[in-house]
Amino acid sequence: MKKFLFLAAALLALGISTACADSDRPIDVAQLPQKAQQFIQKHFAGEKVALAKVERDFLEVRYEVIFTDGAKAEFYKDGEWKEVDCRYSSVLAAVIPAQIAQYVSGHYPDASIVQIDRDKHDYEVKLSNGLELTFDLKFNLIDIDD
């Protein structure tokens, strides 16, 4: 009987967690956190939004905005930016920390930053030449991937 109850509880928990996980739904830009809205107004003024959505994983909420030119911005639940991916153009200089911009322009003068991603451990930038550079939070280069 104990095994049956344990199995039933495990299946119920699995069903609930599966139902809550991986829930993506489109939203209006006005439903984004205030910081995310301000970021878009400042750095993507004049760009048309193709899709804004909220992504809910088990314990995490993120927002993603895709623009009609193919650029994408991803935000944490508090509205701080997580990733900016411009695919076909350079990430705006105002988004890139000055130390990273200086390193890239000094070491890769013919390349531009087309994607930047940050988390609580590091910054990752993708260059137009295909290289991916990783910097720690003190902006020291810690990895290069090609």
Give residue ranges: language-model regions.
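Bacterial Sec-dependent N-terminal signal peptides
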Residues: 1-24
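Interaction-mediating elements
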Residues: 22-146
